[in-house]
Amino acid sequence: MKSSTFGMLALAAAAKLVSAHATVHAVWINDVDQGEGNSESGYIRSPPSNSPITDVTSKDMTCNVNNKATAKTLEVKAGDKITFEWHHDSRSDSDDIIASSHKGPIMVYMAPTEKGTAGNGWVKIAEDGYTDGTWAVDTLIKNRGKHSVTVPDVAAGEYLFRPEIIALHEGNRQGGAQFYMECVQVKVTSSGSKTLPEGVSIPGAYTATDKGILFDIYNSFDSYPFPGPAVWDGASGSSSSPSASASASAPAATSAAPAPSSFTTIAKQPATSSTEAPSTENTSTTSTIVSTTAAASATAPATPSSTSAIASSAASTNSVPQPSSNAGGAVKEWYQCGGLNYKGSTQCEEGLTCKKWNPYYYQCISA
């Protein structure tokens, strides 16, 4: 499907007056909530704000601006499902997750903790981009900020899992893509049979002119070329019966089941309108996981014959008060201040200027 409709979607996003960034607030293991993890006493190396990284050469690309160990580490074993839960402000049902204008892919990397902290050894274990007119971020919003990966059958030890969103609403100019990532502290307790590859360096895996980073979502296209390395062909985990895990839990038994030979991918759900309000029903559903060996797109970098996408699950969270959006008055840094059909304030806070990136999106940035 051609994506010439994304200009219309950008207009719809502007009409909603949503200019939201995002961070990972929590993690679920085998559908068990591990609680808020984005604090010094938690298990996520969280930044002090939800502002993006835009310089692909910055050391902040590794784990965002707060690459420091936190108090807790989650315990998992091969085959366990790890679900990352993203939000704009809070785990409230009314939270908008991330601006619907922030179209782009979602990827997940992992690395041994010591190497990963230093920016080395990062292995891509999952990716989800653009399929049949739907971006990974669209699916993330629909699923209330959740996407999942399977723990590979790797050696026991401590690892960092690094979920990453690349928002491409300003990707039509060099340096315009926005990167959102955190590092989740995880201990694998099973003794796997697979050796994690050497991996890549982050920063270093991307350049500002990579086809998947300098990418114009407002022009017609059929597919999306993922930046960085291919998904590791050993990324599929294995477990005879994944059990619920908790933070700092007792070591789990070693898995003896062989890992699948192909990657896992999500069965895509129908696309929804950018203006549709997210569901707040107190239900939980998990998307169907299937195997695929489809050939990679000719427009994407060379990858193995099968690819891996991020599985997503929808679940609601407890409702707490949600701050209102800034529809009037001075607009804060990084928030929208103009564009076609935009109805909010066009006056930025002192020291900021309203920068036009494209006809659909103006943003308050440092003067």
Swiss-Prot record:
SMART domains: fCBD (SM00236). Disulfide bonds join 63-183. Keywords: Carbohydrate metabolism, Cellulose degradation, Copper, Disulfide bond, Glycoprotein, Metal-binding, Monooxygenase, Oxidoreductase, Polysaccharide degradation, Secreted, Signal. Its cofactor is Cu(2+). It is found in: Secreted. O2 binds at residue 169. Glycans are attached at residue 282. Residues 235-262, 270-287 have a biased composition (Low complexity). It comes from the Eukaryota. Cu(2+) binds at residues 21, 102, 180. Residues 37-56, 234-287 are annotated as: Disordered. Lignocellulose is the most abundant polymeric composite on Earth and is a recalcitrant but promising renewable substrate for industrial biotechnology applications. Together with cellobiose dehydrogenases (CDHs) an enzymatic system capable of oxidative cellulose cleavage is formed, which increases the efficiency of cellulases and put LPMOs at focus of biofuel research. The keyword Metal-binding applies. It is an enzyme of class 1 (oxidoreductase). Binds 1 copper ion per subunit. Its EC number is 1.14.99.56. Residues 329-365 form the CBM1 domain. It catalyses: [(1->4)-beta-D-glucosyl]n+m + reduced acceptor + O2 = 4-dehydro-beta-D-glucosyl-[(1->4)-beta-D-glucosyl]n-1 + [(1->4)-beta-D-glucosyl]m + acceptor + H2O. One of its GO terms (cellular component) is extracellular region. Has a modular structure: an endo-beta-1,4-glucanase catalytic module at the N-terminus, a linker rich in serines and threonines, and a C-terminal carbohydrate-binding module (CBM). The CBM domain is essential for binding to and subsequent oxidative degradation of polysaccharide substrate. Lytic polysaccharide monooxygenase (LPMO) that depolymerizes crystalline and amorphous polysaccharides via the oxidation of scissile alpha- or beta-(1-4)-glycosidic bonds, yielding C4 oxidation products. Catalysis by LPMOs requires the reduction of the active-site copper from Cu(II) to Cu(I) by a reducing agent and H(2)O(2) or O(2) as a cosubstrate. Active on cellulose and cello-oligosaccharides, as well as plant cell wall-derived hemicellulosic polysaccharides. Also active on cello-oligosaccharides such as cellohexaose, cellopentaose or cellotetraose. This is AA9 family lytic polysaccharide monooxygenase A. It comes from Aspergillus oryzae (strain ATCC 42149 / RIB 40). The gene is AA9A.
